[in-house]
């Protein structure tokens, strides 16, 4: 089985492309079924395995397959699934085989490949991806082992290095940007759209600034209400957004919507109602919640996840020593995993040997039972049984020895001596 990771992320593709390749949660299970079918074939000795990781910053396909053309098949599937021409998608895609795929998984889970160096959210997202793949019946021995070791490595990296300390989160970066627009965040009204983990983090950071008002709008009213109450805020129906948008100076949005929920026209009306007082907007969703054209309005300051990433990266340089430590740990664990993977390659051969030997045994036992039932001498039957088993079990090795010549023959002889420890060595002339 070959391991392969294929995907795009914030290093290789802008948010405009990432949002087109993202998988909504409800689509992942059925997508896994069609993705696995790419690698199914009559010649495949093993069932292919797959998992999909889709976040704001990356969409990645992890697979284990016998298909030697897996890279081309995976890229073609991703292109067809999202209806994006291969020529448009391919320049932004990375394909990582074997040890590169393992190293990448370890780095991603440890926060080394994140926009926010050392952030922990990605680890939870990977665990969710594995849980979804398991429920879809898409995981097997290889990816299960890969992800279990991935989680163990992430725990080791975070427990033995300072990779996650003093990191500037996306939420903190949003507050810093708001402070560039408004002298005091405490004088502003803040609206959060959504009630997921990212919005919760942002609400925590903005609430620490003591805003004039904090409001949460969410499709599920109960969940929005609970989040608002945590920060002494209020909840409002998401349906009221078009008519109340003008009330807010700061708007932070991060929902799972597949289409924008804030359009250009609605923001234009809000700006007019505010008499052109500025609105600071942060769109942390992928796909985006706010139409990108909104950013062209004169009195609107719109920032996406990629924009916040520039601020986040400013704080990454100071932790390069921790990065070096983490990379060293990961490299050791990659080698350990590849050793395990190498041992797995002989499992089908061993299984076949067991099956073949057992078939020979059963055939000879059945023959012996018939002879005994006929009344033949038990001692003679047992002797014939043991002789037949001996001849059949050594037939393969002796035939192989007779077929090869030269260096191959010498290598095979040495190999056979290892199998049969009592075989005499070439310099043993005693015959014993």
From Swiss-Prot:
Q: Which GO terms describe its molecular function?
A: glutamyl-tRNA reductase activity; NADP binding
Gene Ontology terms describing biological process: protoporphyrinogen IX biosynthetic process from glutamate
User: Quick one: which residues bind NADP(+)?
Assistant: 194-199
**Which reaction(s) does its UniProt entry say it catalyses?**
(S)-4-amino-5-oxopentanoate + tRNA(Glu) + NADP(+) = L-glutamyl-tRNA(Glu) + NADPH + H(+)
Q: Does the keyword Phosphoprotein apply?
A: no
Look up the domain of life of the source: Bacteria
Residues the entry annotates as binding substrate: 55-58, 114, 119-121, 125
User: Catalytic residues?
Assistant: 56
Q: Which InterPro entries does this one have?
A: 4pyrrol_synth_GluRdtase, 4pyrrol_synth_GluRdtase_dimer, 4pyrrol_synth_GluRdtase_N, GluRdtase_CS, GluRdtase_dimer_dom_sf, GluRdtase_N_sf, NAD(P)-bd_dom_sf, Shikm_DH/Glu-tRNA_Rdtase
Q: Where is this site: Important for activity?
A: 104
Q: Which EC number applies? A: 1.2.1.70
Q: In which pathway does it act?
A: Porphyrin-containing compound metabolism; protoporphyrin-IX biosynthesis; 5-aminolevulinate from L-glutamyl-tRNA(Glu): step 1/2
Under Pfam families, the record lists: GlutR_dimer, GlutR_N, Shikimate_DH
Q: Which UniProt keywords apply?
A: NADP, Oxidoreductase, Porphyrin biosynthesis
Domain comment text?
A: Possesses an unusual extended V-shaped dimeric structure with each monomer consisting of three distinct domains arranged along a curved 'spinal' alpha-helix. The N-terminal catalytic domain specifically recognizes the glutamate moiety of the substrate. The second domain is the NADPH-binding domain, and the third C-terminal domain is responsible for dimerization.
What family does the Swiss-Prot or TrEMBL record give for this protein? Belongs to the glutamyl-tRNA reductase family.
Question: Additional comments on file?
Answer: During catalysis, the active site Cys acts as a nucleophile attacking the alpha-carbonyl group of tRNA-bound glutamate with the formation of a thioester intermediate between enzyme and glutamate, and the concomitant release of tRNA(Glu). The thioester intermediate is finally reduced by direct hydride transfer from NADPH, to form the product GSA.
Q: PANTHER family given for it?
A: GLUTAMYL-TRNA REDUCTASE
Summarizing the function annotation, the protein's role is: Catalyzes the NADPH-dependent reduction of glutamyl-tRNA(Glu) to glutamate 1-semialdehyde (GSA).
The annotated subunit structure for this chain is: Homodimer.
Q: What is this protein called?
A: Glutamyl-tRNA reductase
Species this chain originates from: Burkholderia cenocepacia (strain ATCC BAA-245 / DSM 16553 / LMG 16656 / NCTC 13227 / J2315 / CF5610)
Lineage here is: Bacteria, Pseudomonadati, Pseudomonadota, Betaproteobacteria, Burkholderiales
Q: Which gene encodes it?
A: hemA
């Amino acid at each position: 089985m070959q391991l392969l990771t294929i995907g795009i992320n914030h290093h290789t593709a802008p948010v405009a492309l990432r949002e087109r390749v993202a998988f909504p949660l409800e689509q992942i299970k059925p997508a896994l079924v069609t993705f696995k079918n790419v690698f199914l074939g009559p010649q495949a000795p093993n069932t292919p395995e797959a998992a999909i990781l889709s976040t704001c910053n990356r969409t990645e396909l992890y697979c284990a397959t016998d298909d030697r053309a897996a890279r081309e098949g995976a890229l073609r599937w991703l292109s067809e699934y999202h209806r994006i021409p291969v020529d448009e998608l391919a320049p932004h895609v990375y394909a990582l085989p074997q040890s590169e795929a393992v190293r990448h998984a370890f780095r991603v889970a440890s926060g080394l490949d994140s926009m926010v160096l050392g952030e922990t959210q990605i680890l939870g997202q990977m665990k969710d991806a594995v849980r979804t793949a398991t429920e879809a019946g898409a995981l097997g021995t290889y990816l299960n082992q890969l992800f279990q070791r991935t989680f163990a490595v992430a725990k080791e990296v975070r427990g033995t290095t300072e990779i996650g300390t003093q990191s500037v989160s996306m939420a903190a970066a949003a507050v810093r940007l708001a402070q560039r627009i408004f002298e005091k965040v405490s004088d502003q009204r803040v609206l959060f759209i959504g009630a997921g983990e990212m919005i919760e983090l942002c609400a925590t950071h903005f609430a620490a600034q003591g805003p004039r008002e904090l409001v949460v709008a969410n499709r599920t009213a109960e969940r929005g209400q609970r989040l608002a109450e945590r920060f002494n805020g209020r909840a409002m129906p998401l349906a009221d957004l078009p008519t109340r948008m003008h009330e807010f100076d700061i708007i932070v949005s991060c929902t799972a919507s597949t289409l924008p929920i804030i359009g250009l026209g609605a923001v234009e009306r809000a700006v007019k109602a505010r008499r052109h007082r500025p609105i600071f907007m942060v769109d942390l969703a992928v796909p985006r919640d706010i139409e990108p054209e909104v950013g062209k309005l004169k009195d609107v300051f719109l920032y996406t996840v990629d924009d916040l990433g520039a601020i986040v990266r400013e704080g990454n340089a100071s932790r390069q020593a921790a990065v070096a430590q983490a990379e060293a740990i990961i490299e050791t664990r990659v080698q350990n995993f590849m050793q395990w993977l190498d041992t797995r390659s002989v499992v089908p051969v061993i299984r076949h040997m067991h099956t073949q030997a057992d078939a020979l045994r059963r055939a000879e036992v059945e023959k012996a039972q018939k002879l005994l039932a006929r009344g033949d001498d038990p001692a003679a039957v047992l002797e014939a049984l043991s002789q037949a088993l001996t001849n059949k079990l050594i037939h393969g090795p002796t035939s192989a020895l007779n077929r090869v010549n030269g260096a191959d023959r010498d290598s095979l002889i040495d190999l056979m001596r290892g199998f049969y420890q009592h075989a005499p060595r070439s310099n043993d002339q005693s015959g014993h």
